[in-house]
Curated annotation (Swiss-Prot):
It is an enzyme of class 2 (transferase). GO terms for molecular function: aldehyde-lyase activity; transaldolase activity. The active site is at K83 (schiff-base intermediate with substrate). Transaldolase is important for the balance of metabolites in the pentose-phosphate pathway. The gene is tal. GO terms for cellular component: cytoplasm. PROSITE patterns: TRANSALDOLASE_1 (PS01054), TRANSALDOLASE_2 (PS00958). This is Probable transaldolase. Its EC number is 2.2.1.2.
Length: 217
């Protein structure tokens, strides 16, 4: 499973990129707002840091305007992935942009039916929001399983990009469900590394090593 960083913070992305933990990046209007920067400026900088897909989202809700904004975003860099809402106009734009050879990410997916339509529209990625489903008392990981089954049944090439990840458990659920990608906030990605027993075991080893009186280098 690939890891995308869900952030528009350059320093956070650079830190994780230096650890070789980044396969791509996803942004959205909320993350752009938090960055305090111009969308084209910050997206271009992210694309220069990361070789993988960088999702940049249109703000338009109607087809013609989506296409205009997508044309602007596509000029930022070759690794731009146009992010579109999973609506009728979004599906229409996805189909058109895919025909132009552009990567697309249909976002705000909350049902297997929506994911099926995303695949039919030729989306590169579909982004099921598992955290927001959990907020509503619906098992988000179950949706990932459903989408995986449907896609495997029909050999769809659209990749499942698990989004709205709030906890390390969400990451594990995404991996177990067969998601192709998990887009993860930097703090959650770092939290995957830690475990209290790892820290405890390391301290025991260090204490015992000191008792040997040895040096390796």
């Amino acid at each position: 499973m690939k890891f995308f960083v869900d952030s528009a913070n350059i320093e956070e992305i650079r830190e994780l990129q230096n650890l070789s933990l980044v396969d791509g990046v996803t942004t959205n209007p909320s993350l752009i707002l938090n960055s305090g920067r111009n969308i084209l400026e910050v997206t271009k900088e992210i694309c220069s840091l990361v070789k993988g897909p960088v999702s940049a989202e249109v703000a338009a809700t109607e087809f013609e305007d989506m296409m205009k904004e997508a044309a602007v975003l596509a000029k930022v860099a070759d690794n731009i992935c146009i992010k579109l809402p999973l609506t009728l106009d979004g599906l229409k734009a996805c189909k058109a942009l895919t025909a132009e050879g552009l990567k697309t990410n249909l976002t705000l997916c909350f049902s297997a039916n929506q994911a099926l339509l995303a695949a039919k529209a030729g989306a590169t990625f579909v982004s099921p929001f598992i955290g927001r489903l959990d907020d509503c008392g619906i098992n988000g990981s179950e949706l990932l399983h459903e989408i995986r089954t449907i896609y495997d049944n029909y050999n769809f090439e659209t990749q499942i990009l698990a989004a709205s990840i709030r906890t390390v458990s969400h990451v594990k659920e995404a991996a177990l469900s067969g998601a192709d990608v998990a887009t993860v906030p930097p703090a959650i990605l770092k939290a995957l590394i830690t475990h209290p027993l790892t820290d405890k075991g390391l301290q025991i080893f260090l204490n015992d090593w000191k008792k040997t009186g040895q040096n390796i280098a």
